[in-house]
Amino acid sequence: ALITGSEHEKDRRIRFENAPRFGLVGKPLDMTYRVISTEGNGAPVDVRVSVNGEQVSVEHATVGQPMKLSVTIPNAGRNIVQLGIDREPGELTDANNRAIALVDGIRENLRVLLVSGEPHAGERTWRNLLKSDASVDLVHFTILRPPEKQDGTPINELSLIAFPTRELFVEKIKDFDLIIFDRYQHRDVLPILYYDYISEYVEKGGALLIAAGPEYAGENSIARTPLNAALPAMPTGEVVDKAFYPRLTDLGQRHPVTRGLDGSASEPPHWSRWFRTIGVKNPEGEVVMKGADDRPLLLLDRKGEGRVGMLLSDQGWLWARGFEGGGPHVQLYRRIAHWLMKEPELEEERLTADGHGMMLEIRRQSMIDDPGPAQVITPSGK
């Protein structure tokens, strides 16, 4: 045997022993790794654990022993779990002081709470879309009869069920991936304190969509409740009943929710008109679609760790019904919902890389005109 090198040389390396290729989003994933040293077993080693570039913990590993690790998969799609240890003085190389595992995040069925106000022409549009998606578990309530309504109907002749407000908005609110208020106005059905809970839910990472109609401009608007802390725009009180073609703004032409929307490339757009816009002032976030007189039509905003969307018209059902040829309501509504629930494919800023043989294909999704060059760092650190 021919042995090269010096007997005094030393090196440490880290590797994954067990790294599943798939994991459920938001759930812990069990993995196993090992730190190996040419000096045999030694003192415990600090191991930095990062997920998608963000350090999530520091583990203490015994050299030479298999170590258990539990990480939470944050996103659907590809996730990168990286382990790293510091270089020791005199080590041959630190190129093997890192280990990487690729984990594809898979969502369990998405839980969506849809709360509809009084019945209207487009009430079933959101319901039908969500019910048709096999990956969505939908909980839908329509407020047909508020508690303050008194018309003499005997209780034993009412066939309606009570709205389980405490169960939905206190006990189980964290279980929902998305809450939709479809033309909902404040009623005594929902105690005023519960709007605070919804705002807190958004701040901590939840998703909220307001599909607004004339009620948003009225005296019982949910903008007049503590929920206003989570809303991207306040109503002016105006309801503009005027025909218009929904159009993408300059920002909307680049935003992944609306970019390339079927029919948007022509002028006027190749879809039907709508006939109502709800006026708002001081919109925050991103205005990606505009309505009558260039008023904001679709707003997308971030609040704390969560996201909020606001559709300022109740006319989307015209696309669903095929009026004047209809429009891409399924494509638009689905993208809105999935952006709110942080689908990686719809992130405004996204960088991905895929290897094909000896070629590396880099893709960047960006809202800026000139994203600039990409920096590639090889395993050698260069």
Regions found by a protein language model. Name each.
Residues A1-K382:
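N-linked glycosylation sequons
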